[in-house]
Regions:
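Short acidic, hydrophobic short linear motifs in intrinsically disordered regions
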Residues: 23-44
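Short alpha-helical segments that sit at the start of domains
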Residues: 1-29
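Short, amphipathic alpha-helical interaction segments positioned at domain boundaries
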Residues: 73-92
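A short, conserved structural fragment
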Residues: 54-65
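Short amphipathic alpha-helical interaction segments
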Residues: 38-56
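A cross-family signal for key residues in well-ordered alpha-helices
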Residues: 19, 51, 79
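Minor-groove-contacting beta-hairpin "wing" of winged helix-turn-helix DNA-binding domains
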Residues: 66-71
């Protein structure tokens, strides 16, 4: 067995974060809360994985909303994973 492989749980975690990042959009509201991240994504992923990403402060989930916020740390980690997977960002 290859020891460099990650567990299915870790893969789900990392790939969900990447998918949230790649499908992000800017909130059109002009009334951002102080320090609120500008990027949002739709919450159509595994709930347990989203809860874990929220616990790790990679996303902010305002319960009752259909979308969530990507934190600066979440954006940076997603970019790092994109680099590892050799996936080009939209901005490149």
């Amino acid at each position: 067995m290859n020891d460099n492989k990650v567990s299915p749980d870790q893969a789900l975690h990392d790939l969900t974060l990447v998918m949230l990042y790649l499908t992000r959009f800017k909130d059109r509201k002009k009334t951002f809360l102080q320090g609120e991240p500008p990027f949002r994504a739709w919450k159509s992923y595994d709930w347990d994985t989203l809860d874990k990403l929220c616990e790790e402060e990679l996303i902010i989930d305002r319960h009752g909303n259909k979308s969530l916020y990507l934190t600066d740390e979440g954006v940076e980690k997603a970019k790092h994973i994109l680099d590892i997977l050799r996936i080009r960002d939209w901005e490149e």
